[in-house]
Amino acid sequence: MNVDALTGGFDRRDWQEQTATDNPVRFAMIGVGWWTTEQAMPAVDAGDLCETTVLVSSDREKAADVAADSETVEHAITYEEFHDGAASDAYDAVYIVTPNALHLPYVETAAELDKAILCEKPMEATIERAERMVEVCDEHDATLMIAYRMHTEPAVRRAKDLIDEGYIGEPLFVHGNMTEPILELVPDPDQWRLDGELSGGCAVMDIGIYPLNTSRFLLDADPVAVRGTVASVQEEFADVPDEHGAFQLDFPGHVYAVCTASQNAHLDSHISVLGTEGKVRVEPAFYPWDDRALQLSHEGTTVEIDFEQIDQMEEEFEYFAHCLLTDTEPYADGEHGLVDINTIKSVYEASETESTVRLD
């Protein structure tokens, strides 16, 4: 197996046509928690196609303090002021990073204000609210993208290229896992991820979505049926159904994905696709702070291709800004996100009914 042939010609940003602009996309950050301040804003600052100009928070003083440390932020406003249209001339797009069940009202306001929308995954806490997000964006012709980092992660994109080029033959099985000790990472028993009304679920909803969605991306297909089992064992997870979860996805053509997720387990992430002639595996896969290794097995030989750590959030923001600047439809639009919400809710249904759930 020729490693140079596998790595040669690969463009980390094969989606990019425009590399600079005099008019960067201006973002309003909806929610000013640690993810915004430590991940999103630094990623935007590092990019070439966008900038942060507005911060929106329930706490004006907190937003103002963060704004004071930024060279580009012009306004720090409250959620109420955002809904009233304050500072709407100062931004072109919004990034929504509130708890899942609070996404919809910010999408509605942004769409009504003729703003583009980058919304964290999962797109909402219920199917009905997610469907309304798509409807309101269609009504106002607003661009909506769901924030799946794996779609612009170079190691995952190269794995997809190899699958598409036939290096593993016909895909047969996908195995994916994402697990973490959430109460060690975020030591707050009252955090919103453990509140079923705010989160819409726990392990499967928050991190099981990674192997689910990445399976869809790598296979370029959507599941047609699902089986699943979820359980909450520890007292801290009493308000959510899935401290742990495992589910099987049936794809067209007798291709199957087995995915596992836990919010109370060893930190781990990986995804692999096994085909009739070989296998690709990315490990670590999903956490943004890791270097990546892409392993390829074919005709009795296994090689490993190392990918240096990149800022996944920078790639995501640059991709979205590039779509807006070039008038290109984002890959992960609202309809794409709806497939995940329907599938996740079907995992819960399958677990409760101990049955296979067919997907529309």
Curated annotation (Swiss-Prot):
Q: Report whether Ribonucleoprotein shows up as a keyword of the record.
A: no
Highest taxon, organism lineage = Archaea
Induction line: Expression is induced during growth on D-xylose.
Keywords from the UniProt entry: NAD, NADP, Oxidoreductase
Q: Which sequence ranges form a coiled-coil region, renumbered to this chain? A: none
Gene3D superfamilies, per the entry: Dihydrodipicolinate Reductase, domain 2 (3.30.360.10), NAD(P)-binding Rossmann-like Domain (3.40.50.720)
Q: Which InterPro entries match?
A: Gfo/Idh/MocA-like_OxRdtase_N, Gfo/Idh/MocA_domain, GFO_IDH_MocA-like_dom, NAD(P)-bd_dom_sf, XacA-like
Q: What is its EC number?
A: 1.1.1.424
Gene Ontology MF terms: nucleotide binding; oxidoreductase activity
Q: Name one Pfam family in it.
A: GFO_IDH_MocA_C3
| Catalytic activities | D-xylofuranose + NADP(+) = D-xylono-1,4-lactone + NADPH + H(+)
Q: How does activity depend on pH?
A: Optimum pH is 8.3.
| Presence of the UniProt keyword Acyltransferase in the record | no
Q: Which NCBIfam families match?
A: XylDh_Gfo6_Halo
- What quaternary arrangement does the UniProt entry report? Homotretramer.
- Please give the family membership noted in the entry: Belongs to the Gfo/Idh/MocA family.
Q: What does this protein do?
A: NADP-dependent D-xylose dehydrogenase involved in the degradation of D-xylose, a major component of hemicelluloses such as xylan. In addition to D-xylose, oxidizes D-ribose at similar kinetic constants, whereas D-glucose is oxidized with about 70-fold lower catalytic efficiency.
Q: What is this protein called?
A: D-xylose 1-dehydrogenase [NADP(+)]
Q: What taxonomic lineage is listed for the species of origin? A: Archaea, Methanobacteriati, Methanobacteriota, Stenosarchaea group, Halobacteria
Q: Which gene encodes it?
A: gfo6
